Regions:
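A short hydrophobic/aromatic micro-motif that marks alpha-helical segments and, especially, helix-coil
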Residues: 17-18, 112
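N-terminal secretory signal peptides and thylakoid transit peptides that target proteins
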Residues: 1-17
Length: 168
């Protein structure tokens, strides 16, 4: 191999990793998280405060039919709670570790994953307590009408499992 051929080959080999990094930097700079773009979530009626039992989940899908969620009236004010007593919260029912369906345990007021045993605290904004998950549960943002008692899902805080963006 001549010196000239060696230098050409070396230059190309050295440039390949740099080109890959440049592409990922450009993609990151143009992602919605870095451009200040907010996603337009649908407003979806999910219940009425007068019909919500205390500490019993009411299931619904949000922001689309592929995303199961649960709304719970805790019976006491909690962080991020909505409604007249600031005690109504909603979360995605997909564990953010591997996407398994979560079960609500009324006695401990936690969501438990039957697949890998992650536990999330519903009274502490879906905080991950233990297990394989590394993030808190995505919170479903709610709005409440004082006039009618109607509750609507209006957004998501956190990324729903298996998605690059919550709105498909």
């Amino acid at each position: 191999m001549s010196r000239r051929s060696f230098l050409k080959s070396s230059s190309v080999a050295a440039a390949i990793p740099v080109m890959g990094t440049t592409g990922s930097v450009l993609a990151k700079e143009n992602s919605p998280a870095n451009t200040g773009i907010t996603l337009d979530y649908p407003e979806t009626a999910v219940g009425n405060v007068n019909q919500l039992p205390i500490n019993k989940p009411v299931n619904f899908n949000y922001p689309d039919s592929g995303s199961p969620c649960a709304m719970i009236r805790m019976g006491q004010a909690v962080p991020g709670g909505m409604g007249p007593n600031k005690d109504i919260v909603a979360y995605s029912l997909l564990c953010n570790h591997m996407g398994c369906s979560l079960n609500y345990e009324p006695a401990s007021r936690t969501f438990k994953c039957p697949c890998h045993f992650s536990i999330f605290d519903s009274e502490k904004a879906g905080q991950m307590v233990t297990g394989q998950a590394t993030e808190d549960l995505p919170r479903i943002l709610l709005s409440y009408s004082e006039d009618t008692g109607d509750i609507k899902a209006v957004g998501v805080s956190g990324l729903i499992f298996g998605r690059q963006a919550n709105i498909l």
